[in-house]
Amino acid sequence: MNFSFIRDRRSFSDFIFILWAGGAALLSYSLVYALRKPFTAATFDGLSIWGMDYKVVVTITQILGYLLAKFIGIKLISELKGQHRLKFILGAIVLAELALVGFAILPSPGNIFAMFFNGLALGCMWGVIFSFIEGRRVTDMLASLLGISMVISSGAAKSLGLFVMDHWQVSEFWMPALIGGCACLLYTSDAADDR
């Protein structure tokens, strides 16, 4: 590997910052995917709702929550103060996890609305995580690493979901809550370390 671009202290400092901050952004958004995407590993064979495939309805419902959150986020994120970002992230992941537990315990069709709240809780996370890295001299590199998380994490969340169902015999309804719970523990343990 050629590191000739690191010619002086400032370049080296930028390189280290890109690895540290970009890696933190990548891992943070990857944990968001652990709360958002594992249900896509489930097939929900034989289930339908309102004459449509159950998984399609669940996916559309979650996307609608996510879409609404994007519109709310336009105002919310622009006004969110730096000292409140971590609280916002923690609140959003707890709400998203509670929605996944609701998805597991509520009977159909009520449980699909839990996925709406899951999407609603997570829809602003990209913007909040990006707010930590924007305005830097190397924002473009940091944003690239954040973007990579979408490519990697979607498949990883689905693979983890399949593993949990196949090897631990967790149901299709409880699997997202189990994986999301693990992500919550990672988020909150890191937040506790920062105090």
Spell out what each predicted region is.
Residues 124-135:
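Intracellular juxtamembrane helix-capping segments at the cytosolic ends
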Residues 142-161:
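Glycine-rich segments within core transmembrane alpha-helices of 12-TM secondary carriers
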Residues 60-75:
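Central cavity-lining transmembrane alpha-helices of secondary-active solute carriers
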